[in-house]
Design a protein with these regions (language model features):
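Blade-edge beta-strand/turn elements of extracellular beta-propeller
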Residues: 4-17, 58-75, 108-126, 165-186, ...
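Beta-rich catalytic cores
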Residues: 21-23, 83, 128-131, 187-189, ...
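Hydrophobic core segments of beta-strands in well-ordered, beta-rich domains
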Residues: 28-43, 82-101, 106-107, 120, ...
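Beta-propeller domains
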Residues: 38-64
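Structural motif
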Residues: 45-48, 104-106, 154-160, 211-217, ...
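Active-site neighborhood of glycoside hydrolase catalytic domains
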Residues: 147, 160-163
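Repeat-solenoid scaffold signature
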Residues: 233-278
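Conserved small/polar residues in nucleotide/adenosyl-binding loops
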Residues: 288-294
């Protein structure tokens, strides 16, 4: 059997660009370098860090978490540990926001993404808070969007926006539910926050891991009200349930979206899709042709 390669040597690539289990990826670009992290549950060292120069060739360079500061993790705990993290770069430091669904939201920081990373610092002690993503706003305010795990707190389909202390990055105000996807975007989760041209954007997967889709929310005010648009779904493609991921902009100005696909026994593999803009909405495709969701 031929060895799988992502770079097919004609200026093109093939998906998945990470044909292995890197669940719940988030990614950023700093200068000429891209960095990606993913969840790892109770595997330790955890929350792997990958590096790339081109979004296609990736190399693992370290881990954000050496140990979890709770005795229960001395033994494997199925479905627990580090869930979907977020990676951000602010004022010369890398920040990884990491949820533990039974204990709360934590962050770790580093000046070098290869490490060392600091010990975990508690942002919010809570059961059922998951999938955090911070946003440093232009006026110095810091916010964190997150979802909920129904298995822990009985809440589902909702995105909450909390305000953080700019110095400690701890929650100072839980804040409102800014989006309720119960009717139109069930299982809304995995929020990733961005700001562009005065718009606040929250990218969310919905519909569940196996057969879901990618939705984008946008608003002029960080607290909403948020409009919603489905921007990518499976359609007639073989890529089931294009799930949560990250928007990155390349040095040449092109936009890209990394997301995972659940391949069952192969794990959650990572795909790379081109992204473009029309009327301040992102569309996950090479060229905008219509407002219909892309595949």
């Amino acid at each position: 059997m031929d060895r799988y390669v992502t770079d097919i040597k004609n200026g093109c690539y093939q998906n998945p660009v990470l044909p292995m289990d890197f669940s719940d990826p988030d990614a950023i670009r700093v200068g000429e370098n891209y960095y990606l992290i993913s969840s790892s549950f109770t595997y330790l060292p955890g929350v792997p860090v990958l590096h790339s120069k081109d979004l296609v060739h990736w190399e693992r360079i370290g881990n954000c978490v050496e140990r979890l500061p709770f005795d229960r993790y001395a033994q494997p705990a199925h479905g627990c540990g580090t869930w979907a993290p977020a990676l951000r770069y602010h004022a010369g430091r890398f920040y990884a926001f990491i949820p533990l669904p039974d204990e709360g939201i934590f962050y770790t920081e580093a000046t070098d993404p290869a490490g060392p990373w600091s010990a975990l610092h508690c942002v919010k002690s809570a059961s059922g808070w998951i999938d955090p993503c911070p946003l440093w706003d232009d006026d110095g305010s810091v916010y964190m969007a997150h979802a909920f795990a129904k298995s822990r707190c009985g809440i589902k389909h909702k995105i909450q926006l909390s305000r953080l202390d700019p110095e400690t990055l701890e929650v100072v105000e839980d804040g409102p539910i800014v989006f309720d996807g119960t009717l139109s975007q069930p299982t809304a989760e995995g929020p990733k926050m961005y700001k562009r041209n005065g718009w606040y954007y929250i990218f969310i997967p919905a519909g569940g891991v196996e057969y879901g889709w990618q939705t984008v929310l946008r608003a002029r005010n960080v607290y909403g009200p948020y409009e919603e648009k489905i921007v990518m779904h499976q359609g007639a493609s073989s890529i089931n349930g294009p799930h949560q991921g990250a928007w990155v902009t390349a040095p040449d100005g092109s936009d890209w979206f990394l997301h995972f696909q659940d391949r069952f026994e192969l794990g959650r593999v990572v795909h790379l899709q081109p992204m473009c803009w029309h009327s301040d909405w992102p569309f996950i495709c090479l060229l905008y042709t219509s407002d219909a969701a892309d595949e």
